[in-house]
Regions:
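A glycine-rich, basic-preceded beta-loop-alpha segment at the flavin cofactor/substrate interface
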Residues: 339-374, 391-408, 554-575, 586-606
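A short core secondary-structure module
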Residues: 266-322
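Flexible, small-/acidic-enriched active-site or ligand-binding loops
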Residues: 320-346
């Protein structure tokens, strides 16, 4: 009888813990069970004594704090690493959003689907259909990247005249004031034509003078600069990175010393600036330079603080001593990027963004704005590239034939095409959901790191798969190659705005664990509270909550793993239910493994970068699954799109599973590893990779026009015009599919099996035999010309490939000969 009541109590407490009931609820359940058990003769005085010994110290606040929490708090403070001011600023920057639900182990899927689907306004759609289409049609990407190594002057002027650099600037200052989602759509379309074009447009609309001025500038600064930035009269750049400070941007050696100097005929207090920056986009052509530097006040002209910290100022580039103009050459994607230097350049304090009172606030300003900008520009450029090369690879695979069949029917090619299709769907879902969060007022610092890392990595993977599909067509650079520049430039997005190797290993989980965990940040903050009683009370409340949270996740994880999450709640009972359930299971596993990792590694967890990376992978792939499911729901749960959803969810959940397994395998204790394997994977690993059959569906989807394929092509420049290779190829795909029945008709009537080339000769054969009409023969011959345009590559006169000094020398020799 006693054993039955004990087991019953364990079950009841487990149910309460699973549903995250309060301590008082658990206490009430325990007391009720003891009372009933006592009347039933199952419990006696000893049982009550044991219960009181445990319950009283935990329930009475004074006793608990003095004898339990106080020693734990003292030990916690000893092992907890101190946070620098820059780390605190980074952690405090931005807001938490859906990723916090995933991190806590109990995602509310109804809440996810209640977030509104982002939509364009009439004005934003008109801009995309008008100026964006126009500028795409103006640009010859080969001319820009190979011959000019810059945008043509007419394109630059068109961008300025149509306020492409003012998408983030408010209308009151002459800007467009577009939503984050609209900015993303614009950048996707520009990228689909030219990575050079989207890079130049993206940077001024991300972290830079315009964004910083709107949030922190004085009214005088806003009124002066923002209208000029909006009209294109000023070209901005922002200089942060130095030779000695790349990923560790807070360690910049550039400095400004507060001193007195002459300014416009008067002696004023100002700053003497010295800097050496590199990798600064738009620096060679900028008219105003946003500068990050460490501000020092050795003579105390502003107060008692000597080292004021990182500060941001606006410097006109026409000031004497400001060095700009020289260029870097980033992987044959020649957007304007270069170094800038200055030595002992005196400016007044009013040049600080926000005025003198914002001295030392630069790092906070930067990380707060980066949490938004990083969610838009690079992810959007990546998505635009992924979707474009997915469509182009699909059309090319259907047009190009080897061994008498389209190469897209070969299983090896299908494997690459399937990944391209899946990435195109899920990456677009992720950027739409994330920019939608920004438009809801969020500053999702963790989300922005997640999609920056994963979408740029997917872009890099996509270029590799596309290059494999295209073979020599992708290798030979020239006006007819739409892959080469993107392939060359893929590492650029990987590296900038937080190198991906740093983002994955340190930022995603390092920031996410503290920001998204419901109790860790409070526990850490308690260490810095000077009032001991207040600190103890704050820590006590957080720790007790943390313990309950961990127990709940332990119970949830065991139950969901043991049952295969079959009883987990889902918002829909259709074919997507499995993905919601598995995601809930892995969410609970993430929450539990986070607490276990913190307990095992303590303060050294921040240095266990590979452990941190795997925890970050878990969080990231759960976010990508969430975005995929939300997109499917937002677009009306169209059955014809389900194959894309299925592939994306299976792929991302498989990566979750692998990260979890690798995490377990790298725990330091063998007994712990064994216990975790038994707890998290009691019947083995449940998720399998997408099947060959499913990947065949996705590969075929990219090769045949359909409504699903059209949805994948959203905000891709597909206009059929001479300078748009991908748009022309899309038309060729339709034409090839249209004439295949004519080709088959000739083969059938002539009783021969011909290869699908020299279609002009096939057309003449059919015409001569009376099989085809003149119109049908003409159509077949026209398709042959278009087909050859698709598969042929460029060749050059050697002189056309000369560059730099060699080109200048050749030109001089020709001039001398003349």
């Amino acid at each position: 009888m006693t054993l039955i009541f004990i087991l019953g109590l364990i079950v009841l407490l487990s149910i309460a813990s699973y549903h995250r009931a309060s301590w008082n609820t658990a206490l009430g359940v325990s007391i009720a069970t003891l009372v009933i058990g006592t009347f039933a003769g199952a419990f006696g005085a000893i049982s009550w004594l044991i219960f009181l010994i445990i319950a009283v110290p935990l329930s009475v606040t004074g006793i608990r704090q003095q004898y339990i929490i106080k020693p734990i708090f003292a030990a916690f403070k000893k092992v907890t690493p101190t946070m620098s001011d820059t780390e605190k600023s980074a952690i405090d920057a931005g807001t938490t959003w859906w990723e916090a639900d995933l991190f806590c182990g109990r995602p509310d899927w109804q809440k996810l689907h209640q977030y509104p689907m982002p939509k364009l306004t009439i004005e934003e759609q008109a801009f995309i259909d008008g100026p964006v289409e126009t500028v795409c049609s103006m640009l010859d990407d080969w001319e820009a990247t190979h011959e000019l190594t810059d945008l043509p002057e007419d394109v630059w002027q068109y961008l300025k005249d149509n306020k492409f650099f003012a998408m983030i600037i408010k209308k009151e200052y002459g800007g467009l004031q577009f939503s984050a989602f609209a900015q993303s759509c614009v950048l996707q379309k520009l990228t689909s034509k030219s990575t050079l074009l989207s890079s130049i447009v993206g940077v001024p609309n991300s972290l830079g003078p315009g964004e910083l001025l709107q949030h922190y500038g004085t009214e005088e600064q806003k009124n002066h600069y923002l209208p000029r930035l909006a009209s294109g009269a000023e070209i901005p750049c922002f200089a942060l990175t130095s030779p000695e400070a790349g990923s560790d941007a807070s360690a910049i050696p550039d400095y400004g010393v507060v001193c007195k100097g002459m300014w416009e005929g008067e002696e004023v207090v100002g700053i003497s600036l010295t800097w050496n920056k590199r990798y600064i986009t738009l620096a060679p052509v900028a008219t105003v330079l946003g500068l990050a530097f460490k501000m020092q006040d050795p003579d105390g002209l502003l107060g008692d603080t000597k080292d004021l910290g990182i500060t941001c100022a606006l410097i006109p580039t026409d000031m004497p001593g400001v060095e700009i103009g020289r260029r870097h050459f980033p992987l044959n994607v020649p957007f304007q990027n270069g170094p800038t230097r200055g030595k002992d350049i005196f400016v007044p304090l009013d040049y600080i963004i926000g005025g003198p009172e914002m001295a030392g606030q630069g790092w906070r300003m930067l990380v707060e704005c980066l949490s938004v900008g990083r969610a838009i520009t690079l992810p959007s450029n990546s998505v635009g590239g992924i979707k474009t090369i997915a469509l182009a690879s699909g059309s090319y695979s259907r047009i190009r034939r080897q061994f008498r069949l389209p190469i897209g029917q070969m299983e090896g090619v299908e494997e690459s095409l399937a990944k391209l299709a899946g990435y195109a769907y899920s990456s677009d879902a992720a950027v739409s959901m994330s920019t939608g969060a920004v438009d809801l007022g969020e500053k999702p610092s963790v989300v922005s790191a997640i999609i920056k890392y994963h979408l740029t990595e997917q872009m890099r993977d996509s270029t590799i798969h596309a290059m494999d599909v295209h073979g020599g067509k992708g290798i030979m650079l020239g006006p007819n190659n739409y892959l080469g520049r993107g392939y060359q430039g893929a590492p650029i997005a990987i590296t900038v705005e937080g190198a991906n190797i740093l983002t994955r290993n340190m930022i995603i989980y390092g920031q996410g664990a503290i920001r998204c965990h419901p109790f860790v940040l409070t526990e850490l903050n308690a260490c810095s509270i000077e009032d001991r009683e207040e600190a103890l009370a704050v820590f006590d409340k957080a720790l007790m909550g943390h313990i309950g949270f961990t127990i709940s996740n332990l119970v949830r994880t065991k139950w969901l793993a043991f049952t295969g999450a079959r009883f987990a709640s889902t918002p829909y009972k259709d074919e997507t239910a499995e993905f919601y359930r598995i995601a809930s299971r892995f969410s609970a596993s993430l929450a539990l493994m986070s607490d276990i990792s913190m307990a095992v590694f303590g303060g050294s967890l921040k240095r266990k970068e590979r452990i941190s990376a795997r925890l970050g992978d878990l969080l990231s792939y759960l976010y990508l699954v969430s975005a995929t499911l939300k997109r499917y729901n937002d677009e009306g749960r169209k059955k014809e799109d389900f194959a894309l959803v299925q592939w994306s969810c299976q792929d991302h959940l498989y990566h979750c599973q692998r990260a979890l397994a690798d995490l377990i395998n790298n725990m330091p204790s063998a007994p712990l590893r064994a216990a975790l394997k038994l707890m998290l994977f009691p019947f083995g690993r449940p998720v399998r990779k997408p099947t060959d059959k499913l990947e065949h569906k996705l590969a075929q989807l990219l090769q045949v026009p359909s409504e699903t394929r059209n949805r994948l092509a959203s905000y891709v420049y597909l206009t059929n015009e001479p300078l748009n290779l991908v748009g022309r190829q899309e038309q060729t795909l339709k034409d090839v599919l249209a004439v295949e029945p004519l080709f088959d008709k000739v083969c059938r009537e002539k009783g021969v099996k011909l290869p699908f080339f020299q279609l002009d000769k096939v057309a003449q054969m059919g015409l001569d035999a009376g099989i085809l009409t003149q119109a049908e023969a003409d159509k077949l011959a026209d398709v042959e010309k278009a087909r050859l345009d698709v598969i042929n590559v460029d060749d050059f006169d050697p002189a056309d490939l000369l560059a730099g000094k060699a080109a200048r020398k050749s030109a001089d020799n020709k001039a001398d000969a003349a």
